[in-house]
Amino acid sequence: MSVSIKPLEDRIVVRPLEAEQTTASGLLIPDSAQEKPQEGEVVAVGPGRFEDGNRVPVDVAVGDVVIYSKYGGTEVKTGGTEYLVLSARDVLAIVVK
């Protein structure tokens, strides 16, 4: 997937995954009651930040599915798709399947 957003330093661009639309028992969850997704696919990664004159690479790669901080990042919309620009520090874990 080609994204027209190029993150700087240790920032990443994530496409949030869809929130669950139904409960485990099959009840439909209305939009007003759905929580913000905290899981998404990494679609772009910055080159990393400088620390003591050396570039520190980002720990995630394009295609990784990550869990991120609930209130981290900045929402942006481009090409009709919503993305989240996060600092690598806002990523809590990589989902391994």
From Swiss-Prot:
GO MF annotations in UniProt: ATP binding; metal ion binding; protein folding chaperone; protein-folding chaperone binding; unfolded protein binding
Check the record and name the InterPro entries matching this protein.
Answer: Chaperonin_GroES (IPR020818), Chaperonin_GroES_sf (IPR037124), Chaprnonin_Cpn10_CS (IPR018369), GroES-like_sf (IPR011032)
Biological process GO annotation list? chaperone cofactor-dependent protein refolding
Grouped into one coarse class, the protein's main location is cytoplasm
Keywords, alphabetical: Chaperone, Cytoplasm
Domain of life of the organism encoding this protein: Bacteria
| Disulfide links within the chain | none
Q: Which family does it belong to?
A: Belongs to the GroES chaperonin family.
Q: Describe, as the record does, how this protein assembles with itself and its partners.
A: Heptamer of 7 subunits arranged in a ring. Interacts with the chaperonin GroEL.
The identity of this protein, by name, is Co-chaperonin GroES
Please name the source species: Pseudarthrobacter chlorophenolicus (strain ATCC 700700 / DSM 12829 / CIP 107037 / JCM 12360 / KCTC 9906 / NCIMB 13794 / A6)
